[in-house]
């Protein structure tokens, strides 16, 4: 169990318990020790002064722990109606949206993601002032309308530890102040970000004048090649000149220039537009 008062994670594993007890260990040191141990059985022993021995095969670590009496346990959350989605879907959704959250606290809401439940649909939204990511998931059941903002840190940690099985589910519980994710033998409890999220629908146009269909890999490879001429921190845009059946991509920097044509299908007007290549790759 770990808890920083904003995010708490509890997991249960099988083992041989010779004597029950509680001890608090430095999370970083403990995780690094376990990560570097051989793939074999691990023994953890402690004494009355909280000195702890962690051994595995021929490796043995001695570290100092603390009493678990003062440990801040994960708050009890009453679990009412659960929202059920597959582990695979949740992990995929996080990966497809987490890149466009803000990485600073200038606007707290931008450091999280909107989870909006409406009947049998879950909408997940993130934005950082430059990009907006939206993913819609169809749910098996109908639910009352709810909107919460989940910290990006919470979703990043879940993405790291969730197995992501297609046939394995995640149960999500919502309260006024917390969100709970239950999967396998792990429970994640997180505080929510307070405040009214941005009105995304008002930011997006409903009458686009140009629609382009393009091979994703071909476009990605082309933009990736263009970044060879852009140094880190340089804000040179990649220019896209869209005409019937063709998209010309070009970039100019003090290093040099590059242009490439890609076959496309286009509906609507021709357009000349520029984008940050890194944002577009993301």
Task: Please place each PLM-identified region on the residue numbering.
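Structural preference for solvent-exposed beta-strand-turn elements
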Residues: 1-282
């Amino acid at each position: 169990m770990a808890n920083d008062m904003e995010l708490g994670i509890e997991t249960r594993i099988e083992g041989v318990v010779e004597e029950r007890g509680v001890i608090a260990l430095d999370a970083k040191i403990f995780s690094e020790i376990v990560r570097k141990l051989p793939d074999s059985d691990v023994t953890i022993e402690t004494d009355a002064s909280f000195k702890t021995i962690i051994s595995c095969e021929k490796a043995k670590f001695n570290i100092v722990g603390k009493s678990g009496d003062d440990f801040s346990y994960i708050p009890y959350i009453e679990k009412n109606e659960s929202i059920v989605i597959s582990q695979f879907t949740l992990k995929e959704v996080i990966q497809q949206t987490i890149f466009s959250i803000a990485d600073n606290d200038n606007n707290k809401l931008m450091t999280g993601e909107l989870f909006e439940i409406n009947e049998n649909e879950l909408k997940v939204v993130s934005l950082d002032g430059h990009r907006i990511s939206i993913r819609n998931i169809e749910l098996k059941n109908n639910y009352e309308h709810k909107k919460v903002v989940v910290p990006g840190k919470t979703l990043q940690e879940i993405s790291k530890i969730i197995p992501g099985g297609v046939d394995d589910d995640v149960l999500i519980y919502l309260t006024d102040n917390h969100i709970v994710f239950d999967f396998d033998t792990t429970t994640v409890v997180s505080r929510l970000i307070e405040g009214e999220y941005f009105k995304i629908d008002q930011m997006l146009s409903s009458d686009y004048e140009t629609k382009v269909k393009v091979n994703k890999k071909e476009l990605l490879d082309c933009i990736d090649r263009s970044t060879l001429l852009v140094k880190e921190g340089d804000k040179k845009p990649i220019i896209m000149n869209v005409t019937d059946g063709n998209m010309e991509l070009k970039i100019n920097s003090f290093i040099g220039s590059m242009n490439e044509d890609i076959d496309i299908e286009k509906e609507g007007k021709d357009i000349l537009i520029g984008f940050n290549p890194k944002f577009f790759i993301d």
